[in-house]
Amino acid sequence: MLCPSCNSESSRVVDSRSIEMGVSIRRRRECSECQTRFTTIERSVLLVVKRNGVTEEFSREKVIKGVRRACQGRDVSDDALKRLAHEVEQAVRVAHGSQVPANQIGLAILDPLRTLDEVAYLRFASVYKSFNCAEDFEQEIESLRAHRQALAAPPVGDNSEDN
């Protein structure tokens, strides 16, 4: 790391902190030559591979923008959208490492969005899954109902009512 004051390559880390919900590291450094202190931000790059083979950096803002459109008119906070984007980024990092196919980002959005707001989920899914008719919506609504019932059902082997 070059010192911004004297261009020396020799510096030591004085302090390190995780920022941006663990995606980046903020390091406070001190130049060994001139003792100037400066800050660096380090982050692991996540690349999105588009259908045509072109790669670009993952953008939480793009995720938020797409989901915000689906949430238009719904009571969904900006903080909730930021948490969802972070959750999506973490999920694709775990599943795909440093490069993720673009279509996997849309898939990773669906589950947390379904939990956040079912109407927004239907809107997003209708575009992502290219719904063509009312039956597509009906099938997705049935899937939502089944998911909701599965979450509400007690775990198998749960005898809490017997006590």
From Swiss-Prot:
InterPro entries: ATP-cone_dom, NrdR-like_N, RNR_NrdR-like
A molecular function (GO) term: zinc ion binding
Domain of life assignment: Bacteria
ZnF (unnamed) intervals: 3-34
Residue ranges of every copy of the ATP-cone domain listed in the record: 46-136
Record keywords: ATP-binding, DNA-binding, Metal-binding, Nucleotide-binding, Repressor, Transcription, Transcription regulation, Zinc, Zinc-finger
Biological processes per GO annotation: negative regulation of DNA-templated transcription
Pfam families: ATP-cone, Zn_ribbon_NrdR
Keyword Protein biosynthesis: no
Cofactor note: Binds 1 zinc ion.
Required co-factors: Zn(2+)
Keyword check for ATP-binding: yes
Described function: Negatively regulates transcription of bacterial ribonucleotide reductase nrd genes and operons by binding to NrdR-boxes.
NCBIfam families found in the cross-reference section: transcriptional regulator NrdR
Family: Belongs to the NrdR family.
HAMAP family per UniProt: NrdR
Name of the protein this chain belongs to: Transcriptional repressor NrdR
Source organism of this protein record: Corynebacterium jeikeium (strain K411)
Lineage, opening ranks: Bacteria, Bacillati, Actinomycetota, Actinomycetes, Mycobacteriales
Gene: nrdR
